[in-house]
Amino acid sequence: FVNQHLXGSHLVEALYLVXGERGFFYTPKAGIVEQXXASVXSLYQLENYXN
């Protein structure tokens, strides 16, 4: 898994992969779309959204 632009279902899949059973949260003001879809995101950045 390399750093890449993630949006839509690809972003959700990556969050499930990274967060696992902990799940993840989404709040529109958190900037997940801007961070992951508009620019390259790392696994570490995605893990910040895991519960």
Curated annotation (Swiss-Prot):
This one is known as Insulin-like protein
Taken from the UniProt entry, a GO cellular component term is: extracellular space
Give GO terms: molecular function aspect only.
Answer: hormone activity
The transmembrane residues are none
* Signal peptide start and end residues: none
One of the GO biological process terms: positive regulation of protein secretion
Q: In which tissues has expression of this protein been reported?
A: Expressed in seed coats and pods.
Family that this chain belongs to:
Belongs to the insulin family.
Q: Which UniProt keywords apply?
A: Carbohydrate metabolism, Glucose metabolism, Sugar transport, Transport
- What does the record give as the function of this protein? May be involved in the transport of sugars to the developing embryo in the fruit. May also be involved in signaling events.
Q: Which CDD domains match?
A: IlGF_insulin_like (cd04367)
Q: Which InterPro entries match?
A: Insulin, Insulin-like
